[in-house]
């Protein structure tokens, strides 16, 4: 009987150890069991996560500067559909990447490279959603913007459908933009500040050329555009609309307040940007961000705050998500 008892004790002990190891593994793959993202989330589990991501982003931005606005735009597109869960990174015939607004996204290879390096340094630890969030911050800093601390601890989503993509549009009214941002728990200050991110990057000529040649079927440019700005845009946009135009003409690779200043003089290419100067509330915010109205606001500081708010939209934690092995496919 003593021998049988000993065997039973050994078996029970073994099963308890297996359960403990399994639970520990699940905690690692589920990024904290439901805790909200916070600064320093990975701690000693992946101490170099930020430096690894920054190194990869820096290399790609130096070789192709357009990767900086590309990554920033990708992060925005990710957060506005199912929250900041890396769903825009998933490949597939009907994934978010195939939706019309996402077909011109760039920088996927940057995120995949950062993920591969992190998998070697800290296997099954850092989510693709967190990598994209860090990369967006680094893209801003590398183009001259102000740094901010990034809360980490998001999980990767498992759902990505092109039919779910419903992003703010380039011709939206101020009221529509306010409505869309409010639906994502972002206020009007966040709206104006994040639109200020158009200080870097480009837009497809096909999206904007109509405003400069046939606004609302009139056969004339939008009368609210500075007339001297029209020939500059048409020179960049051929009739077939097959190229891209700078969102912040003459300062496309520098993150600063130049774009917001151009909004005040009606020298911006997107109608959704131009109308922000016509609405009293958004106009007042622009003036404060430019130091033209008191109390003034620091654009760099406010941009970081709004990016953090956006990065916490509908984050996945606990059993709601996973940590992908590669960013383009669920496990």
From Swiss-Prot:
* Record site: Transition state stabilizer: 73
Q: Which residues carry attached sugars according to the database record?
A: 93, 216
A GO MF label: lactoperoxidase activity
> Cofactor stoichiometry and binding?
Binds 1 heme b (iron(II)-protoporphyrin IX) group per subunit. Binds 2 calcium ions per subunit.
- The residues listed in the UniProt record as binding Ca(2+) 1, with positions renumbered to this chain, are 78, 81, 83, 85, 87
Q: Which cofactor does it need?
A: heme b; Ca(2+)
Residues that, per the record, bind substrate: 168
Compartment annotation: Secreted
Q: Main location per UniProt? A: secreted
Which cysteines pair up through disulfides? They are 46-122, 79-84, 128-327, 205-237
Database matches in Pfam families: peroxidase (PF00141)
| Additional remarks | There are 73 peroxidase genes in A.thaliana.
Q: What is this protein's function per UniProt?
A: Removal of H(2)O(2), oxidation of toxic reductants, biosynthesis and degradation of lignin, suberization, auxin catabolism, response to environmental stresses such as wounding, pathogen attack and oxidative stress. These functions might be dependent on each isozyme/isoform in each plant tissue.
Protein family (similarity comment): Belongs to the peroxidase family. Classical plant (class III) peroxidase subfamily.
Please identify the protein, giving its name as recorded: Peroxidase 69
């Amino acid at each position: 009987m003593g021998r049988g008892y000993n065997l039973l004790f050994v078996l029970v002990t073994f099963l308890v150890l297996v359960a403990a190891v399994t639970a520990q593994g699940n905690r690692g793959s589920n990024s904290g069991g439901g805790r909200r993202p916070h600064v320093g989330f990975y701690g000693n589990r992946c101490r170099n996560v930020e430096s690894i991501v920054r190194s990869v982003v820096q290399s790609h931005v130096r070789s192709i500067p357009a990767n900086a606005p590309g990554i920033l735009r990708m992060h925005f597109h990710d957060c506005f559909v199912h929250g900041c869960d890396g769903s825009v990174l998933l490949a597939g015939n009907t994934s978010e990447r195939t939706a019309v607004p996402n077909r011109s996204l760039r920088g996927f290879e940057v995120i995949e490279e950062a993920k591969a390096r992190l998998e070697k340094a800290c296997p099954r630890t850092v989510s693709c959603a967190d990598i994209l969030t860090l990369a967006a911050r680094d893209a801003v800093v590398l183009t001259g913007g102000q740094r901010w601390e990034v809360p980490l601890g998001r999980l990767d989503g498992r759902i990505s459908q092109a039919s779910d993509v419903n992003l703010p549009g380039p011709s939206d009214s101020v009221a529509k933009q306010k409505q869309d941002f409010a639906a994502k728990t972002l206020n009007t200050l966040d709206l104006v500040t994040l639109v200020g991110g158009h200080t870097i990057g480009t837009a497809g000529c096909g999206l904007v050329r109509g405003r400069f040649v046939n606004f609302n079927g009139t056969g004339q440019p939008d009368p609210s555009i500075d007339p001297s700005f029209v020939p500059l845009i048409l020179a960049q946009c051929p009739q077939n609309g097959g190229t891209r135009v700078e969102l912040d003409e003459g300062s496309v690779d520098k993150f600063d307040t130049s774009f917001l200043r151009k909004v005040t003089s009606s020298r911006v290419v997107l109608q959704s940007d131009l109308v922000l100067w016509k609405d009293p509330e958004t106009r007042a915010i622009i003036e404060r961000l430019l130091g033209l109205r008191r109390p003034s606001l620091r654009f760099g500081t406010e941009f970081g705050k709004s990016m953090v708010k956006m990065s916490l939209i509908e984050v996945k934690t606990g059993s709601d998500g996973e940590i992908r092995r590669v960013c383009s496919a669920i496990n």
